[in-house]
Swiss-Prot record:
UniProt subcellular location: Secreted
Main function: Cell signaling peptide that may regulate plant stress, growth, and development. Mediates a rapid alkalinization of extracellular space by mediating a transient increase in the cytoplasmic Ca(2+) concentration leading to a calcium-dependent signaling events through a cell surface receptor and a concomitant activation of some intracellular mitogen-activated protein kinases.
Sorted UniProt keywords: Disulfide bond, Hormone, Secreted, Signal
Principal localisation: secreted
Sequence similarity: Belongs to the plant rapid alkalinization factor (RALF) family.
Signal peptide from the UniProt entry: 1-29
Pfam families: RALF (PF05498)
Gene Ontology molecular function: hormone activity
Superkingdom of origin organism: Eukaryota
Any single biological process term in GO: calcium-mediated signaling
Protein name: Protein RALF-like 3
Amino acid sequence: MSNLRGTNRFILVAVLVSFVFLSIMNAEARKEIGYPKQRFGEDRTNPYEEITPPLIGGCDPKNPQTCLPKQPANPYRRGCLKITRCQRDV
């Protein structure tokens, strides 16, 4: 009879420990569930809020003074070759 009581106590403790473990895991998982931030400093608490596209290069059509100067798409230039002796400008 005492062996049965010890087994019941062991099962009760095991179930209690597993419930505590699962509740801790659920608390940690709640931190990750939600809408991720798309940009730095964005608050995504309202998922139906209108999302404006990020300004590319900090350029605003209303304030063209904030636009950065345009750069060539590929500024790479080939170096001097022995055969041309750096005489041509590409």
